[in-house]
């Protein structure tokens, strides 16, 4: 699954 932290890291790119 995708965690909130993973989404934030991807969005930060």
UniProtKB/Swiss-Prot annotation:
Binds 1 heme b (iron(II)-protoporphyrin IX) group per subunit. Binds 2 calcium ions per subunit. GO terms for biological process: hydrogen peroxide catabolic process. Its EC number is 1.11.1.7. Keywords: Calcium, Heme, Hydrogen peroxide, Iron, Metal-binding, Oxidoreductase, Peroxidase, Secreted. Belongs to the peroxidase family. Classical plant (class III) peroxidase subfamily. Removal of H(2)O(2), oxidation of toxic reductants, biosynthesis and degradation of lignin, suberization, auxin catabolism, response to environmental stresses such as wounding, pathogen attack and oxidative stress. These functions might be dependent on each isozyme/isoform in each plant tissue. This is Peroxidase 8. It comes from Capsicum annuum.
């Amino acid at each position: 699954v995708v965690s909130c932290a993973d989404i934030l890291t991807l969005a930060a790119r």
